[in-house]
């Protein structure tokens, strides 16, 4: 059993971006949370499972104003969103953020048949899938394609990247060539068959993303990668080789 003080890990990247994750979960289930430091405020993309309070256990998230962007409302990405006062999401998934039912967040599908054990390398203390609930976190703002999140000295453009979920969001920072893709594209098996997924929409999103030339891509799971791997992953997906289903998400 892993205590709260050891549950989260923070790993700094270039351009004042830090990965926060839960290293006691396998990569497929381990959400990559991305903290971006700005002059006037910071930005956090996604909040993980929420097995333990996030802000209390990650010093980086204390003492500064933070805008929390929910890329999509699956349970592994928004378990601690309620801890933040400034909460952004796409309109298509705002109802789930406000009232996170287990079917909508895919938690019911994931934990059915005692499969929640697959989610952990080692369990958080006191974990009980039967009593786990994501607290409501109504959005304080809605964002859509083309909106800009301004941190004072840097800005990210919002990309609506549906397919994995109807309101999935990614972020693009042209100045650094950084794409925070989250679950639309990462270096692992992509999920195309789950509640809210649409393979036709997903294909259109991937074709649009293929036109971007990133320096680095930060996905919602697995390791970050560069432009060549980005194109490889999209091309493989579009060829029909990356369209796999998984019972979890």
What is each PLM-predicted segment?
Residues 1-5:
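Basic/polar N-terminal segments that are highly enriched at the extreme N-terminus
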Residues 12, 19, 70, 88-89, ...:
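Structural signal for conserved beta-strand scaffold positions within catalytic alpha/beta enzyme cores
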Residues 14-21, 127-132, 152-154:
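Short Pro/Gly-enriched beta-strand edge/turn motifs at strand-loop
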């Amino acid at each position: 059993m892993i205590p709260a003080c050891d549950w989260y890990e923070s790993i700094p990247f270039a351009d004042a971006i830090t990965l926060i994750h839960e290293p006691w979960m396998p990569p497929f289930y381990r959400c990559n949370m991305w903290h971006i430091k700005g002059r006037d405020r910071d930005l956090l993309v996604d909040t993980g499972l929420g097995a333990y309070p996030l802000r209390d256990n990650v010093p980086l998230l204390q003492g500064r104003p933070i805008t929390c962007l929910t890329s999509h409302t699956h349970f592994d990405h928004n378990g601690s969103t309620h801890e933040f006062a400034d909460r952004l999401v796409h309109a298509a998934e705002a109802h789930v953020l406000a009232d996170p039912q287990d079917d909508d967040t895919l938690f019911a599908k994931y934990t059915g048949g005692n499969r929640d054990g697959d989610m952990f390398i080692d369990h958080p203390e006191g974990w009980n899938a039967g009593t786990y609930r994501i607290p409501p976190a109504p959005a304080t703002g809605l964002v859509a394609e083309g909106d800009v999140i301004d941190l004072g000295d840097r800005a990210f453009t919002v990309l609506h990247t549906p397919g994995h979920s109807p309101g999935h969001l990614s972020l693009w920072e042209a100045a650094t060539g950084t794409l925070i893709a989250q679950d639309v594209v990462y270096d692992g098996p992509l999920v195309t068959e789950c509640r809210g997924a649409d393979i036709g929409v997903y294909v259109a999103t991937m074709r649009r993303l293929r036109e971007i030339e990133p320096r680095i891509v930060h996905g919602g799971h697995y390791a970050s990668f560069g432009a060549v791997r980005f194109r490889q992953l999209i091309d493989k997906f579009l060829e029909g080789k990356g369209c796999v289903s998984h019972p979890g998400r």
